[in-house]
Amino acid sequence: MLRHMLKSKIHRAVVTDANLNYVGSITIDRDLMDAADILENEKVTIVNNNNGARFDTYVIEGERGSKVICLNGAASRLVQKGDVVIILTYTVLQDEECHNHKPRLVFMDGNNNIKELG
């Protein structure tokens, strides 16, 4: 049997911008993408801690070191600058792989610095 499992999580990132007039997606600082093992164009689920919105989009690489978390296009209607979000990716594993699987967890501080890796 195949199971959908958490692959990576950026926990409590702060939205730095929301740009309605841009092709839909989320722009994420390349350093954060690397820390969470997220690739450009990878599907992500965004959870907005401020309003409860949960939606899917894809990733655009942001400038390394910029700390950018910018929701673009229609997704920008679901967040505001300063909102705290969780960014999730998933993978599909066989049952026997699930027990040893460890997701990549990136815990953020209030300034989009990596506080801890888990």
Swiss-Prot record:
An annotated GO cellular component: cytosol
Subunit structure comment from the entry: Heterooctamer of four alpha and four beta subunits.
Membrane-spanning intervals of the chain: none
Gene3D superfamilies reported for this sequence: 2.40.40.20
Main localization category: cytoplasm
Name of the protein in its database record: Aspartate 1-decarboxylase
Its biological purpose: Catalyzes the pyruvoyl-dependent decarboxylation of aspartate to produce beta-alanine.
Active site as annotated: S25, Y58
Annotated CDD domains: Asp_decarbox
E.C. number(s) listed in UniProt: 4.1.1.11
Cofactor remark: Binds 1 pyruvoyl group covalently per subunit.
Pathway: Cofactor biosynthesis; (R)-pantothenate biosynthesis; beta-alanine from L-aspartate: step 1/1
GO biological process: alanine biosynthetic process; pantothenate biosynthetic process
Cited NCBIfam families: panD
Recorded catalytic activity of this chain's protein: L-aspartate + H(+) = beta-alanine + CO2
Name of encoding gene: panD
Subcellular location: Cytoplasm
Cofactor: pyruvate
Family designation: Belongs to the PanD family.
